[in-house]
């Protein structure tokens, strides 16, 4: 839980700016995004965090099983880091941006699952989707009877 709440600690200001930005990322913004996992790791250490699982999950939450992630490009991240990555991707999909609409939760879950299958399939994606649900609390759905619930 601590890792999930602090995984983007090094880019809080940038996230707020990007929320409103309509233009493509600048080179500096792209660099800041790619370095935020390590900077977050270092910032948490400076703040006194010593739990290695927490620190590694923050550092590795953009790594992928295919080795195409960042910042290290490794494929040996922990299950905790992988779960954070999946949750981060899901949250990004369902969040509105100035340049695009939010993806509906059921579609975001489907995309997350299919993307994960293409990367070799990790059971954690199914676990996350099962926990979050395809219609999270607060969602409106139309029942077979036509009633909206």
Language-model regions, residue ranges each:
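Histidine- and acidic-residue-rich, metal-dependent catalytic cores
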Residues: 1-149
């Amino acid at each position: 839980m601590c890792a999930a709440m602090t995984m983007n600690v090094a880019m809080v200001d940038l996230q707020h700016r990007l929320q409103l930005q309509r233009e493509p990322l600048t080179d500096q913004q792209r660099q800041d995004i790619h370095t935020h996992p390590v900077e977050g790791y270092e910032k948490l250490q400076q703040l006194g965090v010593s739990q290695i699982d927490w620190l590694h999950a923050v550092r590795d939450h953009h790594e992928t099983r295919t080795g195409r992630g960042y910042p290290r490009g490794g494929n040996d991240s922990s299950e905790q880091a992988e779960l954070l990555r999946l949750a981060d991707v899901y949250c990004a999909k369902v969040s509105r941006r100035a340049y695009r609409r939010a993806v509906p939760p059921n579609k975001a879950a489907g995309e997350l699952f299919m993307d994960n299958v293409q990367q070799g399939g990790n059971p954690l994606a199914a676990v996350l989707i099962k926990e979050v649900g395809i219609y999270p609390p607060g969602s409106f759905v139309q029942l077979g009877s036509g009633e909206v619930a």
